[in-house]
UniProtKB/Swiss-Prot annotation:
<protein>
    <recommendedName>
        <fullName>Putative HTH-type transcriptional regulatory protein Mbur_1811</fullName>
    </recommendedName>
</protein>
<feature type="DNA-binding region" description="H-T-H motif">
    <location>
        <begin position="143"/>
        <end position="162"/>
    </location>
</feature>
<keyword id="KW-0805">Transcription regulation</keyword>
<dbReference type="InterPro" id="IPR020886">
    <property type="entry name" value="Arc_TR_HTH"/>
</dbReference>
<dbReference type="GO" id="GO:0003700">
    <property type="term" value="F:DNA-binding transcription factor activity"/>
</dbReference>
<dbReference type="GO" id="GO:0003677">
    <property type="term" value="F:DNA binding"/>
</dbReference>
<dbReference type="InterPro" id="IPR001387">
    <property type="entry name" value="Cro/C1-type_HTH"/>
</dbReference>
<keyword id="KW-0238">DNA-binding</keyword>
<dbReference type="Pfam" id="PF01381">
    <property type="entry name" value="HTH_3"/>
</dbReference>
<dbReference type="InterPro" id="IPR010982">
    <property type="entry name" value="Lambda_DNA-bd_dom_sf"/>
</dbReference>
<feature type="domain" description="HTH cro/C1-type">
    <location>
        <begin position="132"/>
        <end position="190"/>
    </location>
</feature>
<keyword id="KW-0804">Transcription</keyword>
Length: 323
């Protein structure tokens, strides 16, 4: 299946689920292919025919963007290694959930969450430990008796009941048959895999936000009072944020390639619900391209602080909407 067909199918699924979907990111390199929003749920979607094609650098940027913009990274594909992705199964690549189009459809359109996760060694299911313990006690079955029936240790049953261990599909089916009770816990794709925040990582990320960017223009924006998250693979060069506003930030001379990026940034910013700004090195022919505000470098040099820049951006955006 060609990637373009895959992306087209994904857009259809997301739109059917009520998502607003951005234009496809067709500029290389790209850390994500689509942005999509439904209410408070913002997705950064990476599409790869083989999900093993995701590399660590791209995954890191996806996760940084998602965290910075209160969204979720998600990987959608068709195969892994030499086999097709199983439906109703969630795979993980660099802590990003990966799934098939059918699983995407079931989750967002049919509201049917998957039950199975892929891990080294096979496919596993999370057991609702409280339900398991209650069901076992209701039939007056000891840990030892249930363990013997399953062919596992008493300690394993205890771990199932304490929620400390997932089980194979066969074990869960056998358990449900013995106890006549549904025990599998569904997977909230967007939230089940959120990691507990490591204080060291939080401190490191906070330090990065306080460190001036290497790019001269981004550094200038930083000195005005913005936190600036630089990107290497997104259609924009950074995301700039202060206490009252957030804007996707591009930096370039005025050119046809810049105009193309500005159109794409407009589409993405509309989905993300931020402003989109391009800082132009040299002269600009226009004040905006679609919904992306264009500001010449010389104009930026006259700005005193973030309030002044916010005012300029909002006034120029308002003028565009009135025209």
């Amino acid at each position: 299946m060609a990637k373009d067909i895959l992306i087209h199918q994904i857009i259809e699924v997301l739109e059917r689920a009520g998502f607003m979907v951005s234009n496809q990111c067709n500029i290389r390199p790209r850390s994500f292919d689509l942005a999509a929003r439904q209410g408070n749920t913002l997705l950064f979607c990476k599409v790869l025919y083989n999900i093993d094609g995701l590399n660590e650098e791209t995954a890191r940027e996806m996760k940084s963007l998602a965290k910075y913009l209160n969204g979720y990274p998600i990987l959608i594909g068709a195969k892994t290694r030499d086999q097709l992705l199983e439906d109703s199964v969630v795979y993980m690549r660099y802590d990003i959930p990966a799934l098939s189009i059918q699983t995407l459809y079931d989750y967002f359109v049919e509201n049917v969450p998957p039950l199975v996760s892929a891990a080294p060694g096979g496919l596993y299911v999370s057991i609702d430990g409280d339900v398991l313990k209650e069901a076992r006690m209701n039939v007056s079955m000891s840990l030892g008796a249930l363990a013997s029936e399953l062919g596992v240790s008493r300690r394993t049953i205890s771990k199932y009941e304490e929620g400390q261990m997932d089980a194979s599909i066969d074990i869960v089916l056998h358990l449900e048959e013995i106890l006549d009770m549904a025990l599998a816990k569904s997977i909230d794709i967007l939230r089940s895999f959120e990691k507990e925040l490591d204080p060291a990582n939080v401190k490191e990320e906070a330090h990065e936000m306080k460190t001036p960017p290497n790019d001269n223009i981004l550094n200038l924006i930083y000195t005005l009072g913005y936190d600036v998250l630089s990107t290497n693979q997104a259609p924009f060069k950074a995301v700039s944020k202060d206490t009252s506003s957030t804007f996707l930030t591009g930096v370039s001379e005025y050119s046809n390639a810049m105009v193309k990026r500005a159109h794409l940034m407009s589409s993405i910013s509309n989905v993300i619900e931020t402003q989109s700004v391009f800082i132009i090195e040299g002269k600009s022919r226009y004040k905006f391209v679609e919904d992306t505000v264009l500001i010449e470098r010389d104009e930026l040099n006259t700005i005193a602080d973030s309030d002044d820049l916010d005012t300029l951006i909002h006034e120029r955006a308002k003028r565009h909407k009135e025209e």
